[in-house]
Amino acid sequence: MGEAAAATEALARIQQRWGVGVIRRGRVVTDPQLRGLVVRSSGFAALDALLAPRGAPDGLTLLRGAVGSGRTTLALRTAAATQAAGGAVAWIDASHTFDGVEAAARGVQLTSLPIVMPFDINEALETAGSIIAADAADLLILDCAGVRGEARVDGLERLAARARRTGAAVIALVDSAEGVLSDLALECSTVGWLRIGSDVVGRKMCVALRSGPRRDAQVLIDVLEPRSAREAIRNERIAAE
């Protein structure tokens, strides 16, 4: 079965069990000839230089940080870069915070992105497992920020094992990675701001690669806010005239 057909079947099963409204929009689209070759870039060259040749590794990557740390921005950029490389991406919004306008501004192709809004973490993990088991995505992003408990820990580790077997990558957005075994852990924090004149147009973000409690490496990246930057540049030009 081709990847597009597998994706369609997997999403149909999800809708049959949880209801049509659980999937908001989009579909999985990819070139099956690219399976196993898709580069899951972070969208930031400095960070990619620290990662494996294909970017996010097979299995589970934990993307953790406080609200406003840039973790969602990094996930969106990774989704956009993976789509641009021909990969299939799915997004499971267990925290119910997905912003389509922000995603589009970060380059995500919303018409090619299934967005699943599960009722709870158990439904989120079961849905994620169905997508991975169907070999229907190169990259699956699971936003479970704010969710805690043993069900999350056990479910993430089972999901990671499935992803390794199928050659897929799972990126989980979490507040805390305590107790979860992962293939990679990235910790995000905002360490400064980017300005044009007096306008804030982005942030300076630190991404640390961690192995257990130890910090292995870190990189500083600049993240522009597209709309703020455009408005600030326009204001600067008007002021100069």
Where are each of the predicted segments found?
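Detector for small/aliphatic-rich hydrophobic stretches
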Residues: 1-91, 238-241
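Helical mechanochemical/support elements of P-loop NTPase systems and associated helical scaffolds
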Residues: 3-6, 10, 39, 43, ...
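Signal for well-folded cores of large energy- and translation-related assemblies
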Residues: 51-55, 83, 129-136, 164
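Aromatic/hydrophobic pocket-lining residues that form π-stacking "cages" and hydrophobic walls in ligand
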Residues: 78, 128, 159
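Conserved inter-motif catalytic segment of the P-loop NTP-binding fold
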Residues: 86-154
